[in-house]
Amino acid sequence: MMEESGIEATPPGTPPPSTAGSTAASATPVSLALSSPLATPSMSSPAYSPPLPAAVAPLPPPIMTSATPSFVPSAAVSTIAPPLAPAPAPVTSSAFSTSLPQFSAPPPLSSTSGSGLSVPPTGPPISGFSLSSTYDITRGHAGRAPQSPLMPSYSAPPVTGVLADPITQQAPFSSPLASGTGSGSSITFPEEHEDPRVSAAQSGAPTGGLWGFIKGVAENPMVKSVLDKTKHSVESMITTLDPGMVPYIKTGGELDIVVTSNKEVKVAAIRDAFQEVFGMAVVTGEAAQSNIAPQPVGYAAGLKGAQERIDSLRRTGVIHEKQPAVSVESFIEELLPDKWFDIGCLIIEDPVHGIHLEAFTQATPVPLQYVQQAKSLTPQDYNLRWSGLLVTVGEVIEKNLLNISRTDWHAVFTGMSRRQMIYSTAKALAGMYKQHLPPRTV
């Protein structure tokens, strides 16, 4: 029967196997044939040899002949011999010197699947076998049946669920081979290395997202300094384009000043000066009476008029007894013979800190004829003649010169407005006041 089928099951010089051995050989499947996912892992009859896949042909199949028994190549013998041995031994090949790991024989399978066997090759290979630069490692090696590089050579139970990327699963597949035989597989695969560009891109992102980035920037001292300078620049631009915005931007803080006048020329000048020195300040104006002549004459009269304005507001209860106040009073003085000058007196009084300071504006020359007219318009029996004149110099100039205001005639004679004069003196007064204040209140 064996000879008619053309298969030499026993090489020359070896005793014929017993019937029990044949039965065991037929019942024991070939482990190398099972390792290939393309071949059926069992044999239904000893009349056929285990075929090799058509896509992989590194091993010569047994010589098919109907003549007398002939010599079978050692590669075929060594391939078939391991399943017949009671204990598995390392499989060697005469065509390759690569060592293979040992595999334990799987349990016998049913023979009903033998109908799925592929047609054996039509003839033996013409030439020998050798490795070359174009040799595909997935086509099997070392004389054993080819197997998938990512599959073990034993039939594993079906895996349920979704399989992951085969590259990431190569460690679990290679572990049973190494642990079962004590040696790793000769088929190796390159490890998947992480792209450094992706890592750099991920590590460069802030841990806290957008808010974390904003928080980190806001806590930077240099950024804070830049923001402060930017805020000051914006405020300067706004106040330059619209000077009326200054009171709204710089109004606030702990400093509260009351000016003893409701005229904008005085209140605005003092507000700008104190906000320039202190940064922020609340400056308001209240109308007050000086209880002296409308046009004071001499320094003493000027000081008296400024102080009387503050006292009148305190007596009437318009301001608190401890409220800091600034008062402005203008007067004329004959500094040289027949040479008169208009001067402004500024006083700041702070009862809480016991501060009382005075300052004077620059002297603005007044033509002698205007002073003489003001004297002539003042009655001799005027009850406040001791402090000054009934008619101010500004009123006289307004009557004699067209398009000139009685409250701001200084710009015509000097080119500098009265507001500018009060501002410069008030700034000096605010600087002195700041120096006299305790450090904690500055």
Curated annotation (Swiss-Prot):
Transmembrane segments: none annotated. It is found in: Golgi apparatus; Cytoplasm. It comes from the Eukaryota. Residues 19-47, 90-99, 110-120 have a biased composition (Low complexity). The keyword Cytoplasm applies. One of its GO terms (biological process) is epithelial structure maintenance. GO terms for cellular component: cytoplasm; Golgi apparatus. Keywords: Cytoplasm, Golgi apparatus. May act as a regulator of the protein kinase A (PKA) during embryonic development. Interacts with PRKAR1A; resulting in PKA activation. This is Protein PRRC1. It comes from Gallus gallus (Chicken).
